[in-house]
Amino acid sequence: MSNNPHIAWTIAGSDSSGGAGIQADLQVFRAFGLHGCSITTALTAQNTKGIQSIEPVYNLFIQAQWNSLINDLPPTVIKSGMLANAVEKLADLLASNPTIPCICDPVLRSTSDTSLLSEKAFSILQKRII
């Protein structure tokens, strides 16, 4: 698999209902014939009625996920979604790997209108990623 030139990464939150986040991204990647890998930025407890709880993933674990994948399954492209507290970490990782294209799909609010990104994180997103 490490020689597969069609690897897409999703860096996003996990949606326990399967309707969004890394679960949905991986399904889309597969539908387009890509091998998908994921770096989880947040865990959510949610269903079709809304988000009940969000648990951001520590930056050290985000780095560990990146390190685990980068030398074995390097991405052709990265798609980012819900970043929670990981905006600055992702900006640093992308800056250290400038040849990897990144599609930024920032998730600012859930469909049930729960805020998913602070103003400070949004400012960093605008300055360093978008």
What are these regions (language model features)?
Residues 1-77:
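Small-residue (G/A/S/T)-rich helix-start motifs and N-terminal tracts that mark the onset
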Residues 77-80, 84-130:
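Conserved beta-alpha-beta core of the PfkB/ribokinase-like small-molecule kinase fold
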